[in-house]
């Protein structure tokens, strides 16, 4: 287990109101990574599990944008809107809640289910149909699901 510090903002829970999902203005969240965590994230032989979609976004932002010395800590802001088609750089698994419709968090899950392709929605609908049929609880304090990234 390795730590990252993330200042989650209210924007995480702001629903998408734009006509086109891609036009949604994404909020920024500050994060901090210590050198040990950076080293683990940069090691391609490691299997990485992110707890929560905000951690997924933080890790992916770090891997895509940070080229600082691995021996020094990183403080940055992630303003990354992950949606299909998105190819993940460093998260292999994600433990996350069942999110409400119209959220950026749900878009991230759809992208995780269809790496690099725009077709994560059918699989997402199948999973959520089963969750509704089995009375799973949704949103931040509800039930969770473990997602495995299907590397291409």
Regions found by a protein language model. Give the residues of each.
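Surface-exposed, charge/polar-rich loops and edge strands
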Residues: 1-152
């Amino acid at each position: 287990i390795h730590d990252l510090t993330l200042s989650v903002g209210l924007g995480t829970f702001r629903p998408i109101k734009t006509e086109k999902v891609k036009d949604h203005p994404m909020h920024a969240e500050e994060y901090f990574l210590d050198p040990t965590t950076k080293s683990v994230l940069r090691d391609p032989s490691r299997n990485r599990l992110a707890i929560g979609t905000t951690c997924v976004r933080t890790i992916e932002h770090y891997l895509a944008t940070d080229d600082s010395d691995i021996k020094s800590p990183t403080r940055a802001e992630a303003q990354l809107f992950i949606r299909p088609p998105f190819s993940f750089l460093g998260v292999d698994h994600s433990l996350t809640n069942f999110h409400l419709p119209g959220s950026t968090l749900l878009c991230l899950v759809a992208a995780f289910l269809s790496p690099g392709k725009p077709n994560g929605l059918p699989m997402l609908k199948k999973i959520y149909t089963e969750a509704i049929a089995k009375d799973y609880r949704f949103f931040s304090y509800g039930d969770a699901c473990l997602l495995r990234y299907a590397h291409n």
